[in-house]
Amino acid sequence: MSVPDAAVVKAFLLDLQNRICAGLQALDGQARFAADSWTRAEGGGGTSRVLTQGAVFEQAGVNFSHVTGAAMPASATAHRPELAGRSFEAMGVSLVIHPNNPYIPTTHANVRFFIAQKEGADPVWWFGGGFDLTPYYPFEEDVREWHQTSKDICAPFGDEVYPKYKKWCDEYFFLPHRNETRGVGGLFFDDLNQEGFDQSFSFMQAVGNGFLTAYAPIVERRKDTEFGERERQFQLYRRGRYVEFNLVYDRGTLFGLQTGGRTESILMSMPPLVRWQYAYTPEAGSPEADLYDNYLKPRDWV
């Protein structure tokens, strides 16, 4: 098994953050990312980059963090109790994009690396990550293309990889209290180390590098679609699901808050505007009902 090299992973992640920000700025054509570097008293730090009030993106945040600690937090040891008492490094790039136009989906992506060490024992390490798509007014061709790109990213690593991580994504981004998925899914993986460091790192790189390949064509296709107040209000209502998921279920959010992470960076995923409405039900046969009827349950798209 190849030896884990945290420095090489960190260099890739910093470069990935730069490339994704450059790609999103090019798609927006107007706004620029502001960078905000921070340090963590217990060890580590990061750089948050946020674009606001753009021509295409209402808010886009792309965060790099590298935190270290003397002991793993509860959120990380819940499903791996053998990690209790180990020092750790956690690094990753995480992003959430909230577009202006309701016909452009919101999206989230994340790639990360954990390593936990204890004197006299082999290091325990793994990669995780993925990306997912949350449309408000979905187009089937967009969803199929998104999943085809996801499948293409996984293909060099084995035929079983896409179905496995697609299913995991559907299961992870699910709101039990709403009985609906957060969106149309994509890829989700965690605890990846079985194939050794080099192969596992290669897969994480492929997912990170593939994100804009999957998302940019959808933005280009939908960014000039006309919309009105009805569509905007529905977008704001559905953004509420994003808030509910991130604050109640998301493992990364919980990990960040439990490790004393930087709150502004952790909550960068929150939409800038959102609304709730009591007992909302879409009108039968409406475009809004199409989302509920055909997209908020797991489907095979390719």
From Swiss-Prot:
GO biological process: protoporphyrinogen IX biosynthetic process
Catalytic residue positions: 108 (proton donor)
Pathway entry: Porphyrin-containing compound metabolism; protoporphyrin-IX biosynthesis; protoporphyrinogen-IX from coproporphyrinogen-III (O2 route): step 1/1
GO molecular function: coproporphyrinogen oxidase activity; metal ion binding; protein homodimerization activity
One Pfam family of this chain: Coprogen_oxidas
A Gene Ontology term for the protein's cellular component: cytoplasm
Gene3D superfamilies in UniProt: Coproporphyrinogen III oxidase, aerobic
Subunit and interaction comment: Homodimer.
Entry function: Involved in the heme biosynthesis. Catalyzes the aerobic oxidative decarboxylation of propionate groups of rings A and B of coproporphyrinogen-III to yield the vinyl groups in protoporphyrinogen-IX.
NCBIfam families, sorted: PRK05330.1 (NF003727)
Protein name per the record: Oxygen-dependent coproporphyrinogen-III oxidase
Organism: Shewanella baltica (strain OS223)
Upper lineage: Bacteria, Pseudomonadati, Pseudomonadota, Gammaproteobacteria, Alteromonadales
Gene giving rise to this polypeptide: hemF
